[in-house]
Structure formats: C-alpha cells, structure tokens
Amino acid sequence: MPWFKNLIKISKTITNQSSSYKSITPLASPLLTQFLQFTKQYSTNDHVVGLEATKSDQKPRIVVLGSGWAGCRLMKDIDTNIYDVVCVSPRNHMVFTPLLASTCVGTLEFRSVAEPIGRIQPAVSTQPASYFFLANCNAIDFDNHMIECETVTEGVETLEAWKFNVSYDKLVIASGAHALTFGIKGVNEHATFLREVHHAQEIRRKLLLNLMLSDVPGVSEEEKRRLLHCVVVGGGPTGVEFSGELSDFILKDVHQRYAHVKDYIHVTLIEANEILSSFDDRLRVYATNQLTKSGVRLVRGLVQHVQPDNIILSDGTNVPYGLLVWSTGVGPSPFVNSLDIPKAKGRIGIDEWLRVPSVQDVYSIGDCSGFLESTGRQVLPALAQVAERQGKYLASLLNKVGKQGGGHANCAQNINLGDPFVYKHLGSMATIGRYKALVDLRESKEAKGVSLAGFTSFFVWRSAYLTRVVSWRNKIYVLINWLTTLVFGRDISRI
C-alpha cells in the first residue's frame, strides 16, 4: 500500500527531526501523535508488522474479533484501567438488528440502527494502546498468541489490502455467523440478505426503483406484476417482521404515492414449515391471520433454485419476483470453518466459562460459538439476547481475571473463575405490521408463560427495544423517526 508506506516514512522523518515535529500545527499534532505511536513501535523495513506482544509492565491486551451484540457488550463492560482493547471488524459500528427491518421501508433511518464502536467503547479512539481496525481476521496462530489480519477496502479501487499481525493476551472470537443458503444455486447471486445496514439500503433502493420502473409507459402488465412482487424466504422473526413492515408500507404509502401501480404490488412469504416456529401456537395462528389480512400471501414450500427473475420451488412452481429477501437463519462462517479447533454443530466449541478449552487464553461468544457436547449443555440459539448476555458475563469474568493478575498471556491457569455462564431465556417478540406485535414470555417452547398479541404487544415491543438502543443519541433518533412516520408517512427518497 504505497500511501501507507509513505506515511510511515514521513513519520520516521518527523520522529528523527524533533524541531520539525514541534512546528506542526496544533490541529494536526494530536492525529500525528497517535499515528506515530502506532508506526514508531510497529514498523520494520517500511512494512507495518502490527502490534507486538505486551510486556509485563504494560497493560495486557484483549483482542475482540467482531462488532456484533456479543463483542460490543463485552467492549462496553471491559475495564480499560486493566486492559488495552483492540477490536478487529469489517464494520466500524454495531447494528441494532431488531429494528433493521424498519429501515428497509423508511420507517426508520439507517443511522438510527448503527452505533459507532468509538461510542460504545471510547478507549479505542482515545487511549494510545487501544485501537479499532477496519479489517478481517484471516488466521489465528494460537501457539504464538497472534492473529493475521487484512484491511477491508471494499469500494475503494485505488487501495490495496494491507496485511498486519496483532498479538494478544486474551482473544475473544465474536465474529458472528453467515446467512444459511443450504447450498441452493443462485441465492448468493440474486437474493438480498437482511443482516447488515448495507443490506437494508440495497433492499430500499431496489424496492423504490421497481416502483418507479413499473410506472414507466410501455411496461407490460406481466412485467409490472413481476417487478412489484416482493418475495421473502424464511418464516422466522426477521422474515415475518420484514413482511409486516412491507405490507404496512404498501397499504399506507404506496397506495397514496404510487396510485398508478398500487394494484400490482404484492408480498409472498415462503416457509418450509410453520412461521415463527419457536412461538406459542396461539401467537402463530394470530400472526398468520393478521399477515393474510394485510395482503401477505403465505406459501409453504422449499426453494430449489433461484434465477435472476424467478424462483423454482421443489414442486416445480415458478415464482416470478422483482425483489427477493432471504432470511432462513444463520450458520458457521468460512472463517470459523477454517479454524482447526473442536466444533459444536459447526460452531466454535466452548466450555461453561465460554473458553475454547483446546487453546490458551481464547474465548468465543455469540452466534459463532456453541457448548461442546462434553459440557452436557445444548447449543444456544443465535439470538441477540444470548450474545449480549454472553458478552456481559465474559467482560465480568475477564475483569476478575485481570484484577487477580491473570490478564497477560498464559497467566490465568490457577485463577478461580467463579460461577459458569447460565442462560435464561427472557422471551421472544416480533412485530407483524398494522401496529400489532407478538410477545411470548415463556422460557422455552415447552414451558408455560404469558403470551400477548395485538396493539398492547406492539407498545411493549417498541418500549422494550427503545430501552435497548445503546446511546441516547440513537434513542432520540428512533423516537423522532417513529413520530415523523406517524405524522407524515415514510420517507420514500431513493438515495
């Protein structure tokens, strides 16, 4: 990366010429100071080697892979008086996934569901030995306590990816999971997932583009129906919530602002079994009835093949579409699959204290991890509440280890870790459109408990998630967006 090498050369020159450094303007000085602290220690022969192993008189370093619910909760609670924190992730923000579907149709703006890492853990922006790196971890050297990284340069054609290494005292793998495609041909090429902000942006742009294209003179009736047929594959909470938001958008906004094509737009939800299979039976029936009333067509079937303009089901049915959203759950990522460590149903195998027992000083939390069979515990579902609770527990455990002098590499073997992690399910919620939602407060599918449906549940759903939004800034954004949508309708700008 030529520009990066040149900066390192400049930094060396500035370091050697103290008088020149003192003449730098006060505005530029703090930025160069932080850059010098990185390059002066870790540059060799014009190549950035990375962050070297910490010394005994330095704070131990925790490296967190990922910026999802698990990793961000851990970084928020970790004691930065004990540890230096380094986060490596291909995105510089956490996505508040429960509200992501609302951004696809303009109910909320994208910034309302994105929380910058520097706001969650200010140390990565302010402390000299804590960093956030916009990069992917390609490999882990467990024996030498080191990870191999490569910078993310998506959309920047002029920059080459830069490889560097980071040594760790404690490593937390919280890299999440990838969308399951079940090996179905054409899914990755033609479907849109709903896990990241850029996915929601893509859905919104394509939806609005199809609405505008269908209104162009000369477009056939058949093509209008195809362009405005929105297909959602997967009847879990994400698929159902997106279908509900989309039906609301059609009934309230499309009918007003795209009156010429309002009779052509439809939503189809395809699921192999029952929708919302983890919810109470009564709530599933209620959701089915409400979605049907909202105009959502429910189809039970298996997708066999995805083509650019249509889906082929296992029974041979051909389903044309203009927008295809794929939401069939998650599975192990290629990175997790590449790690040579014991697995639990494809996930990284962990013990009761969230450690990876086959290697020293490595922990794993969130969707990428699962309890080993030897623990006698079931693999937990890939839910935000599971990931967040694991992050909170592990931060407390690592703070305890650090206070007892076990923060550095290979120093925690004889420390009492206390009680193991225990997960208690707090219930499930899902919105289904038309100011209605489901609230299932049972601890498990077989247990008894309170279940609610309707407008009261919608109020509970909004209140609960509003309190979970990380910062006051985003809480205010969400409230303003909800109020604006209620009074003026959704934003239909295609930006």
UniProtKB/Swiss-Prot annotation:
NADP keyword on record: yes
Cofactor mode of binding and number, as noted: Binds 1 FAD per subunit.
Residues that coordinate or bind NAD(+): 228-264
Cofactors required: FAD
Gene name for this UniProt entry: NDA1
Its biological purpose: Alternative NADH-ubiquinone oxidoreductase which catalyzes the oxidation of mitochondrial NADH does not translocate protons across the inner mitochondrial membrane.
Topology of this chain in the membrane: Peripheral membrane protein
Keywords: FAD, Flavoprotein, Membrane, Mitochondrion, Mitochondrion inner membrane, NAD, NADP, Oxidoreductase, Peroxisome, Transit peptide
Name of the protein in its database record: Internal alternative NAD(P)H-ubiquinone oxidoreductase A1, mitochondrial
Family annotation (SUPFAM superfamilies): FAD/NAD(P)-binding domain
Catalysed reaction equations from the record: a quinone + NADH + H(+) = a quinol + NAD(+); a ubiquinone + NADH + H(+) = a ubiquinol + NAD(+)
Organism: Solanum tuberosum (Potato)
Enzyme kind, highest EC tier: oxidoreductase
Listed GO MF terms: NADH:ubiquinone reductase (non-electrogenic) activity; NADPH dehydrogenase activity; oxidoreductase activity
Residues reported to bind FAD: 61-91
Major subcellular location class: mitochondrion
Listed Gene3D superfamilies: 3.50.50.100
Transmembrane segments: none
Enzyme Commission (EC) number: 1.6.5.9
Endpoints of the signal sequence: none
Domain of life from the UniProt record: Eukaryota
Motif range (Microbody targeting signal): 486-495
Tagged with keyword Ribosomal protein: no
Entry GO terms, CC: mitochondrial inner membrane; mitochondrial matrix; mitochondrion; peroxisome
